[in-house]
Amino acid sequence: MHAPGSLILSLLLAATVAGTSPALAAPPGQGAHAHDHHGAAPQLRLDHGRKWATDAPLREGMTRMRALVAPQLAAAHAGRIDAQAYADLAGKLDVEVGTIVSNCKLSPQADAVLHVILSDLTAGSSAMAGRTPGADRAHALVQVATAVNTYGRYFEHRGFTPIAIGH
């Protein structure tokens, strides 16, 4: 990824794995999305009406995360996933996020949009792992699936199919 984004995403991932708020893990004055030079947090947006370009590490990581999450939703909605299974899935998702953070190279603008998505994804993963007191793990899985789908709406990824989230 772009160097400044890599630092922020690394801090975001470390905070999520440690169970702290990403905003608390960032350097002072730099929340989880703070490398925007105009002071506003990055927002989800297209690249002049087009999806953002991706690279192989990002596409591969998101494909693997989709494959991990999609088959679990029906069982989660039915209450058939236990705490350990959620924690195991969260650990696998955290590995994928770490791989993306370490290996993908995006433009600074695309990187900023990806930060928003990965922040939502890692917040859901943290809750699934039990690192967010009182969180509903099934709802957290839906949050992760929604973040994966958001990626598909904002990033070019030939063949990407959104996850059916229905209840």
Regions found by a protein language model. Name each.
Residues 54-61, 82-89, 113-117, 140, ...:
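Amphipathic alpha-helix face/heptad-repeat signature
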Residues 1-10:
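Bacterial N-terminal signal peptides that target proteins for export
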